[in-house]
């Protein structure tokens, strides 16, 4: 009976870890054909953000330059000019196709992530007992650690999140989230988030140390500051 009680929270923890991947894989396969059909048959207007509009405009400028070049090269044969027109036409169709697939990809990934979040929220509420047990295990594990190990772990975590080399890690993480939601890469937004998140986390950490750790374990705070200095 005791083994069963211990196994249930562990199974719940494993399911929490792998459930997002399962949900994402399942719903992407299920929704892909529906989203593609909806976009191709019912969407009559194309919405472009500044990044997409700039990219599309650059591509069409390149095609326009090729057309202008065609007018300048009158000495070429009619067959060559005809092949050039066909090539430009194919490139235009390919450009529209890529833009269409990118928009479908964005809708599909965004919808999948929203569904995944809703299911995980409901799953967490239903598994409240398992979460309480896992929380008690984590608290017991941390309580049995020495203050030196706690301070070292806290210092390692803070250096990874808000240390000197953390911006590159934040850039990769935010870029991955952006890509996972299907959004177009935007250097300005990513740079703004990279420069903002570590500052916010650093402020929260200092407040937590001041309000909580100073009251619960003053020795841990002393060791942490000694290692940090």
From Swiss-Prot:
<keyword id="KW-0812">Transmembrane</keyword>
<keyword id="KW-0375">Hydrogen ion transport</keyword>
<keyword id="KW-0813">Transport</keyword>
<comment type="function">
    <text>Contributes to K(+)/H(+) antiport activity by supporting proton efflux to control proton extrusion and homeostasis in chloroplasts in a light-dependent manner to modulate photosynthesis. Prevents excessive induction of non-photochemical quenching (NPQ) under continuous-light conditions. Indirectly promotes efficient inorganic carbon uptake into chloroplasts.</text>
</comment>
<dbReference type="GO" id="GO:0009706">
    <property type="term" value="C:chloroplast inner membrane"/>
</dbReference>
<keyword id="KW-0050">Antiport</keyword>
<feature type="transmembrane region" description="Helical">
    <location>
        <begin position="107"/>
        <end position="127"/>
    </location>
</feature>
<protein>
    <recommendedName>
        <fullName>Potassium/proton antiporter CemA</fullName>
    </recommendedName>
</protein>
<feature type="transmembrane region" description="Helical">
    <location>
        <begin position="189"/>
        <end position="209"/>
    </location>
</feature>
<keyword id="KW-0406">Ion transport</keyword>
<comment type="similarity">
    <text>Belongs to the CemA family.</text>
</comment>
<keyword id="KW-0150">Chloroplast</keyword>
<dbReference type="InterPro" id="IPR004282">
    <property type="entry name" value="CemA"/>
</dbReference>
<dbReference type="GO" id="GO:0006813">
    <property type="term" value="P:potassium ion transport"/>
</dbReference>
<feature type="transmembrane region" description="Helical">
    <location>
        <begin position="7"/>
        <end position="27"/>
    </location>
</feature>
<keyword id="KW-0630">Potassium</keyword>
<dbReference type="GO" id="GO:0015297">
    <property type="term" value="F:antiporter activity"/>
</dbReference>
<keyword id="KW-0472">Membrane</keyword>
<keyword id="KW-1133">Transmembrane helix</keyword>
<dbReference type="GO" id="GO:0015078">
    <property type="term" value="F:proton transmembrane transporter activity"/>
</dbReference>
<keyword id="KW-0934">Plastid</keyword>
<dbReference type="Pfam" id="PF03040">
    <property type="entry name" value="CemA"/>
</dbReference>
<keyword id="KW-1001">Plastid inner membrane</keyword>
<keyword id="KW-0633">Potassium transport</keyword>
